[in-house]
Amino acid sequence: MSLKHTIKPIFYRVGLRLLPVALFQIQHWLMHRRFGTYSYWANLHNPETFNEKLLRSKLDGDHAELTHLVDKAAVKSWVSERIGEEHIIETIGVYDDPEQVPLNNLPRHCILKPTHASGHVIILRGTEGDPTPKEILKTMKCWQRINHYHLSGEPQYRDIAPRIICEPLLGDGASDLPDYKFFCFHGEPAYIQVDIDRHSRHVRRYYDCDWQPQDFTLRYPMARREAPRPERLDRMLDIAQMLSAGFNFVRVDLYESAEQVYFGELTFHPESGTAPFSDYQKDLMLGKLLELREEHSV
């Protein structure tokens, strides 16, 4: 396991127990110093920016009801009930123990990821560049020791049982399908994030719901080229609206294939509420869209 996944959880466990506000403020400041062109000390007692309000929301309320919505296996039934089973990516298998994963009998094109964490994935494309079964097993065993709460402070991840999920790789297997991340405030989509070259030179572009490009980005550089408008944008906006109903904020991630729109995941604290905007005023702008009020039960 990497140093990040050994030292950081210890630091977080102590900080979350003793000084959670200071912990989040320090993490926010460090992320801005590392990835941004400016930095500021997050005010969590009177939050105004988008990041400040996300950080504040990690401290308040009962997040236990969100646990099944960030579990990458459990969330599928909840989403299916709301938008239809046709939008759910097939599940090849869910495994409690990495040793249970049939590494020598997996489909040629598939992905493996932990159900209980964020930002971890193994992509198998059926090429010489794929990791070996031994390497895959080693990585999955590391995943099983992760408690994402102790890496991000997001309480909805604290009590998720560690498992591995296997899904087919959408598209032609050679390249990733475009994914669209809908920033939804109080049940209404407002902005759409498009990531380009995520596994190499990662850049981003943001659009409004009419697919007009915006003059800001979050953490990663702004893409120079514009992404084409998705054919099923209207359907994706409808889906994002349905899935975000009842929440102060949630990011709804969707994929578009040649045949269908597929659900990806729900994210309640993008970048854990610490990623710098390219412009501080945009952090304030999105913050004005987010009211921290009691959320509906799900």
Model-derived regions, located:
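Membrane-proximal basic amphipathic "stem/tether" segments
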Residues: 1-60
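Catalytic phosphate/metal-binding cores of nucleic-acid and nucleotide-processing enzymes, i.e., regions
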Residues: 54, 90-97, 109, 119, ...
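Active-site nucleotide/adenylate-binding loops and adjacent lid/helix of ATP-dependent enzymes
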Residues: 60-62, 66-178, 186
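Beta-strand scaffold of nucleotide-dependent catalytic cores
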Residues: 112, 178-195, 204-206, 262-267
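C-terminal and inter-domain tail/linker signature
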Residues: 115, 122, 128, 192, ...
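Short acidic-glycine loop/turn motifs at beta-strand connectors
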Residues: 126-127, 184-188, 198, 257-259
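A long amphipathic alpha-helix within ATP-dependent nucleotide-binding catalytic cores
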Residues: 159-163, 206-261
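C-terminal active-site "lid" helix and adjoining low-complexity regulatory extension at the edge
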Residues: 256-298
